[in-house]
Amino acid sequence: MKNNPFSLSFGKEPVSLINRNVQSYEIIDTFEDENPTYQVCMITGVRGSGKTVMLTEINKTFRAEEDWIVIDLSPERDLLQSFAANLSNYPSLSEVFREAKINLSFLGLGVEIEGVSPITDLNVAVTRMLEKIKKKHKRVLVTIDEAVCNDTMKEFVSLFQIYMRQDLPVFLLMTGLYENIYELQNEKTLTFLYRAPKIELRPLNIGMIAEKYKSIF
């Protein structure tokens, strides 16, 4: 007997997918636009509706593009610290930051640069790195799976809003259950999330699953 092609381990893509191309292409096309109409998007729905799978597919699309830097963050860790660490250690960027004399040694994120005072504030460090990325005509996509309304998430999303206001090339794609997204956007400093598009994934249609089974077996 063949294995179930739709079985899904946590965070892992299944062998077979039910296409939701319209929603995925909408996000991809908007983020890639020269003047994107939005830079934050949330994918929501009940458990098992395919949120993580869609996030993974979009993630793979952008990773294949040279002018995109894709960073995956966990909502259970210090998001700003993780974001800074991922940027500073990104293979194609570490030398760029070194040449730009961005000294991150005080924060434990890079080597000492002789003759350059180290940056002592994490947010300042991230801003400096993003400014350099912008000059290189690259964009940064941050993905967060299963967003929750905790302190580190509130701090990071609040700062992300500032980066967007500063016209820095940052994009945020999050998944989350209805109740978690609702709680997050109702924070006093995060009401801008109300204006961010939300793609609601409904439970998979039985007919779609049946047709997919027919095409496989």
Language model features by range: what are they?
Residues 1-41, 89:
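A short, basic N-terminal segment
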Residues 115-180, 186-189:
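Conserved Walker B catalytic segment
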Residues 41-42, 56, 60-78:
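Conserved catalytic segments around the Walker B and adjacent sensor/switch elements
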Residues 67, 78-109, 114:
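Conserved NTP-binding/hydrolysis module of P-loop NTPases
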Residues 48, 76-79, 149, 177-182, ...:
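Conserved nucleotide-binding/hydrolysis micro-motifs of P-loop NTPases
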